[in-house]
Amino acid sequence: MTLSRWQAQGNVYLVAEESLTAGAVRAQVGDADGILEVRGRGRDWIEIAIWNTDGSLAEMSGNGTRIAARWLAEQTGAEIITVRVGPREVVARMLGGPFVEQELAYEVGEPGIAAGFRYTPVDVGNPHAVVDANPAEIREIGPALETHARFPNRTNVQVARRLDDKTIEARVWERGVGETESSGTSAIAVAAAFGASDVKIRFPGGDLHVRLDGERAYLTGTAEVAASSGGSSP
């Protein structure tokens, strides 16, 4: 199996054009944060499945869809690409160089308390629980909320604090993966939970820009080739 290695703000995904199984994913993923399985494509559209490191499937990934769009754009030259993940679609616009803007829908729920932590739920095609606290607490708060009974299908967790009017610092605990360097849908979730309509989300892996307009979010970040790896499924 030949895999190309991409990264988006430190979030690493492998891209595979072959059909995968959970076992193959666990065997091949290595130190990446997941694998993007290409299930179909045209000049300006691509359909993918997003595999987590534990062999489970994710409903959505902002960084993953951005990588998929750039991967296709490098081959076809398309400047606007629709990325399909299950029933959802993300429109991605190439901005020049490694920069890509994506448009995604989001919805903020009612705040709650779980495992002693107050959180704001946000749906960005996948579930998020945003906690306003010191991001250094992610390894305590993340696993406590991810598997809490309040979230029967588990949840992604963000621990964030506002640095100024235009900057929020955050760390991410992704369900089925653990802590990651950044997350695109997490950036949207954090901005939405904080009510910040035009803001930079600062992750350990780099910054993402989020602009909210009604129920739509516009996420801008990079996607770049990291390296290549090869192997074969068991």
Predicted region positions:
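A glycine-rich beta-to-alpha transition motif near the start of alpha/beta enzyme domains, typified by
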Residues: 1-98, 130-234
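Active-site glycine-rich loop that binds ribose-phosphate moieties when present
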Residues: 105-118, 138-143
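Extended Gly/Ser/Thr-rich low-complexity repeat segments
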Residues: 111-120, 228-234
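Extended Lys/Arg-rich, glycine-bearing segments that form polyanion-binding/interaction patches
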Residues: 86-112, 122
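Internal active-site segments that recognize and position negatively charged phosphoryl groups
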Residues: 115-138
